[in-house]
Amino acid sequence: WPFSRNEKPKQFLDFFGTGRSLLQMTIDRFRPVVPIENILIVTNVAYRELVLEQIPDLRSNQVLCEPARRNTAPCIAYAVARIKSMSKGSHANIVVAASDHLILQEDVFRDVIAKCFSFIEKNDALVTLGMKPTRPETGYGYIQMGDEVSGEAMCKVKAFTEKPNLDLAEKFVESGDFLWNSGIFIWNL
């Protein structure tokens, strides 16, 4: 991006002229379904103050900082360990979501999250959200849909494919059996 820089990456920018950054829009999207005191943000230590500036109702202990940029898995593991220690044996619903998604139908999104919470309360499952692809895209991961889950508008995951080449992406879209991987995961601890 021409505007995004190391000192202020895209999640801290107001791309749409709304007066809200992508991070602020993400927090706003989750407020109706997750109390602010239950939200943790994992970020690089260099962005700690920027997070607290943009989300002033977060306490400093809700911003978990990694000393160096790594991939997503260590960040998720760090946050889950923290949630586990905070929950003191009681269960906790966990949603992992990036701070740079654009979601236009936020009410529909929140309904889906609430449905996922209900599902994981009754089932030992990890839920991931997929989106119907509109074109072959080599920059996204894909989820191959498996069998439908009885009584739910959900299906099991048959396979994940990370960023396929164009030929494979075209086959995925043509088959109708694949979704784009949103990177949003929901489960119960």
Feature roles, as predicted:
Residues 12, 63, 126-128:
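Conserved beta-strand scaffold positions in the cores of enzyme catalytic domains, especially
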Residues 1, 13-16, 144, 161:
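Residue-level detector of conserved, well-ordered beta-strand and adjacent loop positions
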Residues 2, 6, 14-96, 104-108:
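Conserved N-terminal catalytic core of the sugar/cofactor nucleotidyltransferase
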Residues 99:
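Short acidic donor-binding/metal-coordinating loop in glycosyltransferase active sites
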Residues 105-189:
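Conserved core of the sugar-phosphate nucleotidyltransferase
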